[in-house]
Amino acid sequence: MTNLEAIDNRRSRRLYLPTPIEVDKLAVLQSFIDAYNKESNLSIRFVEDGSAAFDGLRKSYGLFKGVRSLLVMAGKKEDANLKEKVGYYGELLVLEAIKMDLEACWVGGSFDRKSDIVELTDSEELVCVIPIGYTEKLSFKEKMVHQMVAGKSKPIEKMLVSDVKTPRWLLEGLKAVQKAPSAVNHQPVLFEFRDGVLKASVEDDGKFNLVDFGIAKSHFEIAGQGRFEPGNNGKFIKL
């Protein structure tokens, strides 16, 4: 499965089975975690049993069940691009999980941050978590949620400001962004294409917009075949 196919196949799953993740798959996932931590200076951790962050928590409103394995997305508080990096590298890890027939879901607020799932240093910030594991077939509730989300994807014309006809690579990138998860499916990222230069920006709402920004960038780069400069208004470099 390619990354593009993983983007097409990914769904945000909330109901997990107790089936453990195989050792060989965990090894592959950990190799990517190590590589991305080194590249980004993040401190992503895989937690085999993070169920305490969800067990008996009213904040999850019953949407999450059977959560066990987690990616804990954390990094240095002083990192100006922390949340963007978390979104970017976290989504790359999600896609690797999808390619191994696992499922995942971004969780920013519906978990117990006071649970002792991981020990952080004073200089680190826990941004969010990503449950990972095996799931049953889509439940009726999940199908309804996915149908509602799919029907609310932001139209490309509302994502893009451009003074020319949209080139094919840009269109493909934006289509991939439409499939990117975001808080309440808000899809806050704005792309501007002027004088042959593409830039991406987002309003920093102090919550999860910058995480969504990183997720959107990862999807765009895979489909658009290039790389964004880090930060708001970073330019896209076509490869």
Predicted feature locations:
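Acidic, surface-exposed loops and disordered segments
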Residues: 1-239
